[in-house]
């Protein structure tokens, strides 16, 4: 008998051992991940057994992973990484294709198969994660720039939420993770500094010099890095103990890397910390309740059956109150809240049924379809967490009551339908009336007539400084009539262009329009040959005609009018010969759009049977253009006329007006702007490839970058020799033609200067391309363009990156005063970077001229095995003084 008892006890012990010590996996999970970040799946055991009672077993179990019921094999190497004896799977650079069902499979101690499933769902990154991704660790080693700081994946994964929330009195830490590119022999120092400030981006900040630890670790020991690296990994942790309300605010961490070659790079991030002052789990650490809290609750209300009703209870001030809304089910006429009352809403951190965790001072309860059983008395009650106990329902607490009455409104539905129909009818009538008024104003009385006045200091101005000084015209717009109809418009035309036919035409224009529009009186047959001739050249015969006192107005001369979609007409003086008629243009597809307007590709049809059509670009305004847009257009046209022609400056061919809309016809650059061109080569292949007009594939090299730089410098040298400053030189404003030659464009901000130009008006400016004197004093010189050219050099050798990526535009001036400059591009030699730093000298007089820059770039090019560039662009000699007649 005793033996049987021992056997039974032994069997029970073994069964308990098997139950208590058997290996189990945790429950199935739903895992959320963010695009571009690792997806981490953990198949480890739940570790429920006691190691003092159970035999310790080395976990050498096999783990197999499946995706969508298909086993994951070696074909995913590089994309997927298995760590911790294959118990954990990391999928790098997560994307939508990684969504789905995953399963890990292993065996327990009884050699039975067990498994765990994961439902992986991709979510949008938080605003903080999107900010961090801009400087995240590059998955491709070729995108890694030496001497830069990047955020490690751990940094981004830890910021699913934009705000850090810590319970009052708790302990926590703020943690930042860095990857520093470059070997230890190249790095001089790496420093991390923490600050506290009450407002974001505030200059009033306090240095934190305690409870901080910065660690160095081997990058190749980190599981979340998808590749082997040569740099260093750091983490910095700020410890927070017993946090209080005064600790709430913004914590910024700034990392600075200084290289032995003199370059530096910085990376910063700001944490927003909020303190939960109502902590139900530890009521002793909450603030004391104010003696007279204010409760705002619904007033007595009547609602129809099936309508929606919202109960809203708000408590001020926001302190540690437990807020509830009650319904009294025992007696609707008794406004006292009883113990058996039904609690409609209590939340703790989003989990219903336990209480209210005070993240907000407001509690809401809604019923989408009210029924009769919802009628009754409701109460909003607050309880201080500090005094919270199980018998709180039996104590008198601050509360506000309201009565809800529910009624059947079906009998009133007829009047509701009538009222609804009348309201809709009134709205439709108002809309129709508004449209009729708009159409009436547009086609009857809606025109506002303005005249464009273009005044030149001299009657003749020429595109060469050896003939006459180059001066831009003064362009103004004057309203001459408001809300005239079609018949009045015809009378206006007759008044301006047919009366007093014996008066010389030049005097008429002076009388009615002062000086006028940009285009000269000449006729040009459009063909491929004359597109290469300078704009503004007219014959002596035509000049004599225009200056003759006997010139009269032709009775059939058409009036030139611009008209926008706001019913405003801009009257321009009529011209005998526009360079292009609308019929000579075949407009193609849209190739670009910006704040100025829209750019289309087009063909110019030849007037000659033997000449081919010419591909051009057409720049036009948006249909909603206004006075300033017209002025900017005329200024750019005037400036391009004065500039003339140069191999590395985009050419103006002419313009025309089509149904009141202006078209500026310019040279077509098939490869678009330089910035996008470089970025496209960077993203399409590891080594950029371009295709020239001959059909040959060419790889972009440093020699090409030097050629681009020299060509842009030659164009800027030409502008500076003519005392012209561009003011908006950037890679986005340099175009690339079919032969991959550089063409400077966008002269909307360009000005002519003797020594300097001072900007007196506000407007959008290219802050990160501007010199310090432009930012501080609004003074522009040729040396300001030299500074901008240095930024263009940096853009070229970084293949289109944005300058100063870690500095906001409003902080640029202070950064430049502190001596901060763009770091050395990975593709630039030391000699090239020294040239950039010289160009970015604070003193404009110490910066190189464009001629000196060309010489230095040519020397660098020859040192790299290139050939000296041929400067065979069109030169205008001093005896070629082309006059342009302005009426």
Curated annotation (Swiss-Prot):
Family stated for the protein in its record: Belongs to the protein kinase superfamily. Tyr protein kinase family. Fibroblast growth factor receptor subfamily.
EC number of the protein: 2.7.10.1
InterPro entries: Ig-like_dom, Ig-like_dom_sf, Ig-like_fold, Kinase-like_dom_sf, Prot_kinase_dom, Protein_kinase_ATP_BS, RTK, Ser-Thr/Tyr_kinase_cat_dom
Cytoplasmic-side segments: 438-887
Name of this protein: Fibroblast growth factor receptor 2
Gene responsible for this protein: FGFR2
Membrane-protein topology: Single-pass type I membrane protein
Residue span, Protein kinase domain: 585-862
Entry keyword Repeat: yes
Keywords recorded for this protein, A-Z: ATP-binding, Disulfide bond, Glycoprotein, Immunoglobulin domain, Kinase, Membrane, Nucleotide-binding, Phosphoprotein, Receptor, Repeat, Signal, Transferase, Transmembrane, Transmembrane helix, Tyrosine-protein kinase
Binding site for ATP: 591-599, 619
């Amino acid at each position: 008998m005793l033996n049987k008892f021992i056997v039974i006890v032994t069997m029970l012990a073994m069964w308990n051992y098997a139950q208590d010590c058997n290996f189990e996996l945790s429950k199935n999970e739903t895992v959320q991940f963010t695009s571009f970040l690792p997806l981490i799946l953990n198949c480890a055991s739940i570790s429920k057994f006691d190691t003092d009672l159970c035999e310790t077993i080395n976990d050498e179990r096999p783990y197999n992973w499946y995706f969508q019921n298909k086993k994951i094999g070696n074909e995913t190497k590089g994309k997927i990484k298995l760590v911790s004896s294959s118990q954990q799977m990391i999928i790098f650079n997560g994307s939508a294709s990684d969504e789905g069902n995953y399963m890990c499979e292993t065996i327990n101690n009884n050699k039975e198969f067990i498994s765990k499933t994961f439902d992986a769902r991709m979510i949008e990154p938080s605003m903080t994660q999107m900010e961090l991704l801009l400087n995240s660790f590059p998955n491709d080693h070729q995108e890694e720039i030496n001497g830069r700081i990047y955020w490690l994946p751990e940094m981004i994964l830890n910021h699913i939420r934009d705000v850090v929330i810590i319970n009052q009195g708790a302990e926590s830490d703020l943690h930042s993770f860095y990857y520093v590119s470059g070997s230890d022999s190249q790095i001089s120092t790496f420093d991390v500094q923490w600050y506290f400030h009450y407002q974001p981006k505030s200059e009033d900040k306090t240095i934190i010099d305690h409870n901080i630890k910065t660690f160095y670790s081997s990058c190749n020991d980190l599981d979340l890095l998808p590749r082997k690296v040569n740099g260093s990994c750091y983490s910095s942790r700020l410890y927070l103990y017993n946090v209080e309300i005064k600790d709430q605010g913004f914590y910024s961490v700034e990392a600075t890397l200084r290289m032995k070659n003199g370059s530096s790079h910085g990376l910063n991030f700001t944490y927003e910390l909020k303190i939960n002052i109502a902590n139900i789990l530890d009521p002793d650490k909450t603030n004391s309740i104010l003696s007279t809290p204010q409760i705002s609750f619904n007033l007595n209300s009547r609602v129809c059956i099936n309508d929606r009703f919202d109960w809203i209870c708000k408590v001020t001030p926001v302190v540690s109150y437990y807020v509830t809304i009650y319904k009294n089910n025992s007696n609707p006429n008794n406004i006292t809240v009883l113990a058996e009352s039904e609690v409609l809403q209590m939340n703790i951190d989003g989990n219903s049924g336990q209480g209210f965790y005070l993240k907000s001072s407001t509690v809401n309860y809604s019923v989408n379809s009210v029924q009769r059983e919802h009628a009754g008395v409701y109460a909003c009650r607050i309880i201080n967490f500090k005094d919270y106990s199980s018998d709180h329902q039996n104590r008198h607490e601050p509360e506000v009551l309201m009565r809800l009455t529910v009624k059947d409104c079906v009998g009133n539905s007829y009047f509701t339908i009538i009222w609804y129909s009348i309201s809709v009818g009134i709205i439709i009538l108002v809309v129709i009336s508004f449209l009729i008024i708009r159409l009436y104003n547009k086609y009857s009385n809606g025109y506002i007539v303005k005249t464009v006045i273009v005044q030149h200091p001299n009657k003749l101005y020429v595109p060469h400084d050896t003939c006459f000084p180059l001066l831009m015209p003064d362009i103004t717009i004057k309203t001459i009539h408001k809300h005239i109809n079609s018949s009045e418009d015809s009378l206006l035309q007759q008044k301006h262009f047919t009366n007093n036919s014996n008066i010389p035409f030049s005097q008429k224009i002076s009388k009615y329009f002062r000086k006028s529009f940009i285009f000269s009186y000449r006729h040009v047959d459009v063909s491929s040959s004359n597109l290469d001739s300078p704009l503004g050249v007219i014959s002596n015969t035509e000049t004599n005609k225009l200056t003759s006192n006997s010139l009269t107005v032709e009775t059939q001369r058409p009036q030139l009018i611009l008209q926008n979609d706001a019913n405003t007409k801009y009257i321009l003086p009529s011209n005998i010969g526009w360079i292009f008629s609308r019929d000579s243009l075949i407009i193609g597809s849209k190739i670009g759009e910006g704040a100025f307007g829209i750019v289309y590709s087009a063909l110019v049809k030849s007037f000659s049977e033997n000449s081919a059509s010419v591909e051009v670009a057409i720049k036009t305004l948006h249909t909603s253009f206004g006075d300033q847009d017209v002025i900017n257009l005329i200024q750019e046209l005037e400036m391009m006329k004065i500039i003339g022609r140069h191999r590395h400056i985009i050419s103006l061919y002419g313009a025309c007006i089509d149904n009141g809309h202006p078209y500026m016809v310019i040279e077509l650059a098939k490869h678009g702007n330089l910035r996008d061109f470089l970025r496209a080569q960077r993203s399409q292949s590891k080594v950029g490839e371009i295709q020239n007009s001959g059909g040959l594939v060419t790889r972009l090299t440093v020699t090409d970058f030097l050629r681009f730089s020299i060509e842009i410098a030659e164009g800027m040298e030409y502008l500076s020799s003519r005392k012209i400053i561009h003011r908006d030189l950037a890679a986005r404003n340099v175009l690339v033609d079919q032969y991959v030659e550089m063409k400077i464009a966008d002269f909307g901000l360009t000005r002519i200067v003797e020594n300097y130009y001072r900007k007196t008006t506000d407007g959008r400016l290219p802050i990160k391309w501007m010199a310090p004197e432009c930012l501080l004093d609004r003074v522009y010189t040729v040396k300001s363009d030299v500074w901008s050219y240095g930024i263009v050099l940096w853009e070229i050798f970084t293949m289109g990156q944005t300058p100063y990526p870690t500095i906001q535009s409003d902080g640029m001036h202070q950064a430049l005063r502190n001596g901060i400059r763009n770091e050395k591009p990975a593709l630039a030699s030391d000699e090239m970077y020294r040239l950039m730093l010289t160009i970015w000298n604070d003193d404009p007089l110490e910066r190189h001229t464009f001629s000196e820059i060309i010489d230095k770039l040519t020397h660098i090019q020859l040192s790299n095995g290139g050939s000296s560039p041929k400067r065979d662009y069109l030169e205008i000699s001093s005896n070629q003084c082309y006059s342009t007649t302005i009426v």
